[in-house]
């Protein structure tokens, strides 16, 4: 029987699962940048991101982080808990890069005195604008208690991921997290991949992420394969 699609985003499709508490997430090869202004396809990106995200979520589970991920079903699909997505993106910045470097006039690659957490309102029509906690609560996107829990989880995930990737000679420059509500709890959702993270080789500072697509640097698929190979060797 053909699965019923519940939602299609830029990089993934969400389908009904056999029970109401789960969904099947399908990873596409579509690539977008600049809020959809730039579009293309990257060969095997969906397969690579599914494998990378599955491996990272499994590692986070071992470290006590609860996520929506249940198991990898095949090359492109995961079984995940059906969460109510909190319409926020949490951006963690360990090193100045990307839009923050441009916005604040900071040179890319500058080490920061402290890690920066930013939140954006998930709204494609508005271009996912940067907001603060008071906006989020005033607009009914989250409560202060939920934000506190989101930041606690984010801090723990950042510490785990920085250590994990550095062991693979990868610097975690910045990354985006999304969260969902499930059975009254806030849990980590979405994906963790070169689509949502900036990964630099710790020795050469070579970019191993979607910046290669954004900036027309070439070898995009090869960079994603390199990330998968390094984290696979970590197991």
Curated annotation (Swiss-Prot):
- Enzyme Commission number(s): 6.3.2.6
Gene3D superfamilies per UniProt: ATP-grasp fold, B domain, Phosphorylase Kinase, domain 1
Q: Which UniProt keywords apply?
A: ATP-binding, Ligase, Nucleotide-binding, Purine biosynthesis
Pfam families hit by this protein = SAICAR_synt (PF01259)
Q: Which GO terms describe its biological process?
A: 'de novo' IMP biosynthetic process; cobalamin biosynthetic process
One example of the protein's molecular function in GO is: ATP binding
Q: Does the keyword Transit peptide apply?
A: no
Output the InterPro entries linked to this UniProt entry.
SAICAR_synt/ADE2_N, SAICAR_synt_PurC, SAICAR_synth, SAICAR_synthetase, SAICAR_synthetase_CS
In which pathway does this enzyme or protein participate?
A: Purine metabolism; IMP biosynthesis via de novo pathway; 5-amino-1-(5-phospho-D-ribosyl)imidazole-4-carboxamide from 5-amino-1-(5-phospho-D-ribosyl)imidazole-4-carboxylate: step 1/2
| Catalysis performed (reactions) | 5-amino-1-(5-phospho-D-ribosyl)imidazole-4-carboxylate + L-aspartate + ATP = (2S)-2-[5-amino-1-(5-phospho-beta-D-ribosyl)imidazole-4-carboxamido]succinate + ADP + phosphate + 2 H(+)
Q: Which PROSITE patterns match?
A: SAICAR_SYNTHETASE_1, SAICAR_SYNTHETASE_2
Per the similarity annotation, which family is this? Belongs to the SAICAR synthetase family.
Q: Give the protein name, as stated in the record.
A: Phosphoribosylaminoimidazole-succinocarboxamide synthase
The organism of origin for this protein: Clostridium novyi (strain NT)
Q: Which gene encodes it?
A: purC
């Amino acid at each position: 029987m053909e699965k019923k699609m519940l939602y299609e985003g830029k990089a993934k499709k969400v389908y009904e699962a056999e029970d109401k508490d789960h969904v099947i997430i399908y990873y596409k090869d579509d690539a977008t940048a600049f809020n959809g202004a730039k579009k293309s396809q990257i060969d095997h990106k969906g397969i690579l991101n599914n494998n990378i995200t599955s491996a990272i979520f499994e590692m986070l589970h071992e470290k006590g982080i609860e996520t929506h991920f249940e198991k990898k079903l095949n090359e492109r699909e995961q079984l995940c808990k059906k969460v109510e997505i909190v319409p926020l993106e949490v951006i963690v910045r360990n090193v100045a890069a990307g839009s923050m470097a441009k916005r604040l006039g900071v040179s890319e690659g500058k080490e920061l005195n402290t890690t920066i957490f930013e939140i954006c309102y998930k709204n494609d029509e508005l271009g996912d604008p940067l907001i603060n906690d008071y906006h989020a609560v005033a607009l009914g996107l989250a409560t202060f208690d939920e934000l506190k829990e989101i930041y606690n989880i984010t801090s723990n995930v950042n510490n785990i991921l920085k250590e994990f990737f550095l062991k693979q000679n990868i610097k975690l420059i910045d990354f985006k997290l999304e969260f969902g509500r499930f059975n009254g709890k806030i849990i980590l959702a979405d994906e963790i991949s070169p689509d949502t993270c900036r990964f630099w080789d710790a020795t050469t500072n070579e970019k191993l992420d979607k910046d290669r697509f954004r900036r027309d640097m070439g070898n995009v698929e090869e960079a994603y394969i390199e990330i998968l190979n390094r984290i696979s060797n970590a197991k």
